[in-house]
Amino acid sequence: MNMSKDASLERYYGFREVVGCTTAPQAALMAYFLKALNDTGVRGDVLEIGVYRGRSSMLFGLYLHGRRRLHLVDPGLKGDVLEELTRNLTDIAPSMDFERDVIIDMRMSQELQYDYAVQNRGQYAFIHIDGGHSMLDVYRDLQQAEKMLGEKGIVICDDFFAAGRPAVTEGVYKYLHDHPGVFKILLTGYNKAVLARADRYEEWWVRIINSLGEYLESNWRPVQIHLYNSPLEFPTLGLSERTKEQCPFGGYFEREESHALIAALSKAVGAQGNK
C-alpha cells in the first residue's frame, strides 16, 4: 500500500459540515481497509446497515471507483434525508453515477430476511454494521454478514466498546461464541471492531502489522498497535493514539518488531497445519 497521502480521505476531511457521528480517526481506519481492498483487487460491493444522514456513506462512496456499488439500508432514507444524502454523495464523488452505483433500501436490516442473504451470498467486500444497537440486532446483522461477505472481505461493527452502547459489544462476542470458526476480530480501536473470515485473518493480520500504522500516521496521527498474547491464542490487535508516556506493562510494539511477529505467526500456523 502506498503510504503517501490518501487523496480520497483528504477530500472526505473537507466535508466537515455534514451531520453524523463518524470521527476523523474512524474515517481513517475504515479508509485503510477500503483502500486495501481496492489495491489488492478484491471484488464485491459495499453494504452499510444503518446510515443516519450518510456521513460514513460519503466516505464509502469515494472508494467505489466505478467498480463497486454502495448498498445503503436504513428505514429513514426518504424525503429530505434522502435528498440530502443524494446531494452529499454526488458532491463528494462527482464521478459517481448515483442511479447506477447506489442502492437505497428503506427496510430494517432484519426485514432483509434469509432469502435476501442467500441471494446476495458473497456479494459484499465491505460491510459496515451500525443499525440497531441491541444485542439481538447486532447478532442478527452478523448472521446476515456471514452469508453476504465475500471470501476476502471485511466487516466493521460500529460502537464496539462504546460506553453508551454496551449491548453492541455483547452482541458481537455472543455471535463469535455461538459461531466459532466463521469470523475473527482482527482489530479494535476508535469504537470499531474489524472482523475478517477466520480462514483469512492471517493475511489481513500481516497486512495490518506491516502497513496500518504508517497509513494512519500519514493520514491521521501516529498510533500504537497493541498485542498482549500469542497471535494464535488471541490474534486481536488493539489500536490507540500514540502518547508521550507509555505504560511499562503494555503489549505495544513498534514497526521494527513486526517482522519478528509475522515470522512467529507464520511458523506457528505452519506447525498447526502439520499436526
Regions found by a protein language model. Name each.
Residues 2-24, 31-275:
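S-adenosylmethionine/decaboxylated-SAM
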